[in-house]
Amino acid sequence: MAIYSQVPWTLPRYKFEVKVHPLAATSNLQPDDGYKIELRAENTVDKYPAKQHARRVAAQIRQGLGLIFLMGQKSTLHEDSDQERSLRQRRYFFYLSGVDEADCDLTYDIKTDKLTLYVPDFDLRRAIWMGPTLERKAALRKFDVDEVNYHSALDEDVKKWAKNQDTGSTIYLLHGSQGPAENPPNVTIDSKALKLAMDACRVIKDEHEIQLIRRANDISAAAHLEILRGIKSMSNESHIEGSFLNTSVSLGAHKQAYQIIAASGSNAATLHYSKNNEPLKGRQFVCLDAGAEWNCYASDVTRTFPITHQWPSIEAKQIYQLVQEMQESCIALVKEGVRYLDLHFLAHSILIKGFLTLGIFKGGTLDEVKKSGASLLFFPHGLGHHIGLEVHDVSPQSIMAQGINDDSNNILILPTCVSPCTTSSPALISGMVITIEPGIYFSQLALDNAKPEQLKYIDMARVKNYMAVGGVRIEDDILVTKTGYENLTKVPKGDDMLEIIRQGKKGNDSPCVDRPTW
């Protein structure tokens, strides 16, 4: 049976129809088969729902009155240079505006339900050199706001608002340093409640946000497929990075959600390897962790693959299949109400059972090995994280919170485990988008610093046979639903992946995605 999925969605100005399918009539790919992603666009109007977001945040604050004040990212120069830094919009500002332009601010009057955007005043010299900035009428048409004023009116508007408020009214700031030029004397400044309220809202994605993440994933899928098709002609990690960037930009994604990781051989044992400059010759696997960004929303996709269309060694195949089992078993259990941490524990249990079978672990039961923490030497990070405006997106608690031991499972949760992979994280809720990204890594540094209670269960002679594997990670972006999940990542794995590599590029396969006509 041919694999076929059709996903229509709406983005600002365009409606896209996406089809991801192998061009085959049966489940077995044939030499002339291939994966193709089709993107078709038609004009529509669908603004980013900034006003809806503002109302949700205000409801979370629960104070009834007050003014939300948010500053956007300012234009800045590189140190000791006249060259501007690339804009990366402040994500909290974007959530309440949908504006990906520099030097803008906003206010939201909770009582009157009025969302006001402030755009830069016209600057003739800058317009001649850089092009015009946002004009008020154009901004009002483009963004989901009630009013647009020039930035020069901001301070006076805040003063006017304060004069009409009772003493003790509140201005809500994200940070104490990001407020009005002068704090009105009759109002209270609160720099704590707003972030907590926005984090609680951002963790549950609305339909518009889901479609943006879906779009980012489809562009990433196209880029990953292009690399699988061309990997046999690549000789350096830099070629992989360059190919991913080329496909992403050609499809309109000019920014990456994070720095590309194109790690071959033992480099894949470094979780966030980023040099991407070493030759591929003699390496067994490449671990490619790369995700495009679309309209400030991230994708996060990892695939591990050989340089050729065959498993490079029996050890490489064993580890890949074990990681794939870890991932597929965890994804299958995702639904509302599930505790994500239990999926993390499940992944460790599958790893331990697999290592006991392979002889990498020895001399203990599953529970004994688990209690020792030996599996953490090979799987040292959390199973995944939230994804949205940030690749490691926010949650109701700080994503940098210190981890805690869970005595019921005897698995140490490291500080690198972030929400929802902590003991204090709430159960999964419909509308969350999470990653499931188990990995197995053979890091000499980790093994050299292992504790005696961990080494007790490790057959180091056996481990040596696997060191050349480097590292294997497989990662998908998963939308939580009330009854299950939707996998937003459409990149082949396992044998399907090997078949794509074997087929290589044919004819006009580059790029492997039909560019939308916008």
Curated annotation (Swiss-Prot):
One of its GO terms (molecular function) is metalloaminopeptidase activity. GO terms for biological process: proteolysis. It catalyses: Release of any N-terminal amino acid, including proline, that is linked to proline, even from a dipeptide or tripeptide. It is an enzyme of class 3 (hydrolase). Its cofactor is Mn(2+). Pfam families: AMP_N, Peptidase_M24. It comes from the Eukaryota. Belongs to the peptidase M24B family. This is Probable Xaa-Pro aminopeptidase HCDG_07916. It comes from Ajellomyces capsulatus (strain H143).
